[in-house]
């Protein structure tokens, strides 16, 4: 599993000029882990639950804040990497790779799963012309925040304790991971 949510912060140049804003202030829990990589952690834990161990390797700015970093999440049968950056930009993409193929999800870690592809294994391609085996399996999505608001509203109106507990437990799990990694 590879998640990447790298978004060049509009405040990063000011930070490089030593003008500190909340987004890069350790006293306000600024930084890449808390502000950006948290979305990757939610994505991975939402699919696979709590990892057996986690590690954070970060690029540190002049005031000790993490401007970018990679969380390594260890599961019994695989490793997940979560890249979060405020000092550079990259397409927001998640790769779920296995011996049966790869799911490529554009925008997943930011909450927008606008394009989903399945890429079948290519076998041994050395010396052979590459063949594009991607198949688009996306579904149309309305505004990406709409489903969250609808879920919250349904949980409250229907007093859905099971869904409430599921979301609460996932959030608590992510908070515990953030505290361990900070």
Protein language model regions, located:
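Contiguous beta-strand/loop segments that form the cofactor/metal-binding neighborhood of enzyme cores
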Residues: 36, 40-113, 119, 142, ...
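Interdomain hinge/lid region at the active-site interface
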Residues: 129-137, 141, 148-151
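A short glycine-threonine-serine/GTX helix/turn-capping micro-motif
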Residues: 27-34, 134-143
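C-terminal helix-rich "cap/oligomerization" subdomain common to oxidoreductases
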Residues: 136-137, 150-182
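Extended amphipathic ligand-handling, pore-lining, and cofactor/metal-binding catalytic surfaces
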Residues: 125-127
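Short, flexible active-site-adjacent loop segments at beta-strand->alpha-helix junctions, enriched
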Residues: 4-9, 86, 109, 122
